[in-house]
Amino acid sequence: MWAKAKVQINTPITSTNNKVNFQFAHALSRLGYTIKLHEQYPSATFKLNKITLAGSPDGTTNAFYKKGTIDLSTVKDPTSGATTGLWNTSSSDKQNFDWFSGTYENLSTTASNPDKANNYLFVIPQEFKEKTTENPDVDELYVIVNYTITYSDNKTQTNTVYKQIKKNFERGKAYMLNLTIGLPIEFDVNLTEGVGVEDWGEDDGINIGSNDNNPWDGIE
């Protein structure tokens, strides 16, 4: 949280009438996720093993800034309107997040969270793009999902699917990654985004998979 206020006090400093009104705002971005099946499969069961947020499809490149500094002098001035931003993330020290690691078998066509509905990840605001020859020095983000399918003949198949997320995660906004998994040709991720208000607002959603013409980038 952060707040900034400028006020001129005309009464003695010891007076109880001296009050400064602060309006607090969220300094971070909030990320959440849900997962569901593309459809019910009578001849197969699904088990979620792991969800990772990383800077590359194989998880070897880090994505998120570990630290940064907040400079309140760069916050938009209500009078002049001048601003240059809030966060300084000049450090190249980054990290990935294992959002879920374990066993989750309660998968259905209804979106759910293996942990709990309000289990969120709070990150330093950061813009993720796709690297190109012209712009090689950008931050990339991938969501990687590992799950196991058990068929009716007891044969198993473990899949790892990934999708690049190209999004500017802004401070004070909430985002929801809605993941859909299924048989090897059926995957979906949706990201929903919330407005930047003090109570986080509605989530900005990212949908990935077959239902939204936005399929997973790859499967292993």
Language-model features, listed with the residues they occupy:
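Short N-terminal edge-element motif at the start of the domain
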Residues: M1-Q23, H38
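Tryptophan-paired
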Residues: Q8-I9, P42-K173, S210-E220
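Intrinsic-disorder/low-complexity, polar/charged segments enriched in Ser/Thr/Lys/Arg/Asp/Glu/Gln
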Residues: K19, R30-G32, A174-M176
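Generic beta-strand hydrophobic packing signal
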Residues: L31-Y33, N49-S56, V75, N190-V195, ...
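Short amphipathic alpha-helical segments with coiled-coil-like heptad repeat character
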Residues: Y41-T45, T180-L183
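Intrinsically disordered, low-complexity repeat and linker tracts
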Residues: F169, K173-E220
